[in-house]
């Protein structure tokens, strides 16, 4: 995929028969959202663990799809955004190739030591803030000992953008929602640490949370 003047390399394609939507008619080759288990807390531990392993694998590695006859790589960040990032309207984002390409460039910039970031020229109201908010939350909650911040041309806009990340965290499915102290009142920062009262028993029951 071309991103400006740079060629963005994607992961090696698997055999087509291993791609999602293989064998379907072109009209049926659409992106499909993950089916989240109901009453996750009530599932037995082994079922929770297996589900968590599958979700973390996709979050880290992404997956290849066949969409309308085309091979499309949905990166881990894009997959996370489409399946788990709840918008202010209370729904998941609509699948769009624009977002797929954005996250491919996002990951390229993140992993290239010679790249200092992205300069994005875009129209208003295309969901750019939500895509970036999801990307920041994704990185901040999947890696240990990482600091992530945001700046804007005035404090009001920065606060508004930060609130979107907090809202996404509050709506996050349990399998990806880090533990936070119960007394943690989010004002200027969102901190993920084990509460002092988090017992050894609780930690043992939730050891699948360390899959990241």
Annotate the PLM regions.
Residues 1-212:
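Phosphate/NTP-binding elements of NTP-utilizing enzymes
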């Amino acid at each position: 995929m071309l991103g400006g003047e740079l060629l963005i390399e994607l992961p090696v394609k698997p055999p087509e028969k291993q791609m999602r939507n293989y064998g379907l008619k072109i009209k049926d080759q659409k992106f499909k959202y993950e089916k989240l288990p109901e009453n996750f807390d009530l599932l037995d531990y082994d079922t929770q663990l297996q589900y968590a392993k599958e979700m973390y694998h996709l979050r880290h590695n992404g997956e290849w799809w066949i969409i309308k006859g085309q091979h499309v790589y949905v990166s881990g960040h894009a997959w996370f955004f489409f399946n788990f990032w709840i918008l202010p309207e209370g729904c998941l984002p609509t699948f769009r190739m624009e977002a797929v390409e954005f996250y491919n460039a996002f990951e390229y910039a993140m992993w290239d030591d010679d790249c200092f970031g992205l300069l994005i020229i875009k129209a208003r109201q295309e969901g750019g803030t939500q895509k970036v908010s999801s990307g920041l939350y994704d990185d901040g909650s999947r890696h240990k000992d990482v600091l992530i911040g945001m700046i804007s041309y005035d404090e009001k806009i920065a606060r508004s953008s930060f609130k979107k990340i907090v809202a996404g965290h509050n709506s996050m499915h349990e399998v990806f929602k880090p533990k936070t102290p119960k007394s943690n009142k989010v004002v200027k920062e969102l901190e993920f640490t084990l509460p002092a009262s988090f017992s050894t028993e609780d930690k043992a029951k939730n050891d699948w949370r360390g899959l990241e």
